[in-house]
Amino acid sequence: MQEAVVLMRDELKESCYVEGVQYLPLEECLPRTDVILTIGGDGTILHEANFTLQYQKPILGINIGRCGFLATCEVDEMEEKLAALVRGEYLLDNRMLLYVRVLGEDGWEGHALNDVVVTKGRLQQAIDFSIYCDDILVEHYRGDGVIVATPTGSTAYSLAAGGPILDSQTKGIVVTPICPHSLTSPAMVFAQERKINICVGQVIDNEVFLSCDGAAEYPLSAGSTAEIRLSDQIVQLVTFSRADQFQAIDQKLRSRR
């Protein structure tokens, strides 16, 4: 790639006009795009990864958020790294996705780059959850919820709940309880080929919700089952070093101590 043409959604023309940029409807932009640039934090990357999934375009995150763990370009690096992007001097980091569907008549489904979370509503009592791996009961939790995370998501909510950090190239799924009412309820790591089912137990005057990457919540009821497995799609993140994840851990997580 020796030269670049910048495309932007036409609805941004008034608020973000830049001379030389082509403003087109979104459905025309994406098929012509080589790389999607996001400007924001991790939430922006997660949103765009799901929103543009069908186009399978690499994403480069430019961080102006608080952490920007998934972004590999800081504002003060833009000139250098965008020039490298135009020259084709970058790498593509393939990240696995989770596919989730709620079993039942409506069959709600979604994808997650970071995590699938089943949790109780605010100020509600603890809820019982049963975890099945390939239809075999492996754990029963009573607590505030359960996080099912990818290696990408292992440094996000799952980590804050006590889960392990996985190398982004590890082929695994992390299941982490949220505030379990037990001294012996550790996070568990499963092979990516496994099918994970989360079954909601008895619910008394409680609200239970499922969300993918922190997006809109889907309500669950007693007896509901969410089936989670490896998606047949991936997300490609633009990176400039194979060590970017470990550099981010050192610079953006340890630096907070």
Walk through the language-model features, giving the residues of each.
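Residues in the short beta-alpha loop(s) of Rossmann-like NAD(P)-binding domains
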Residues: 10-12, 179, 232
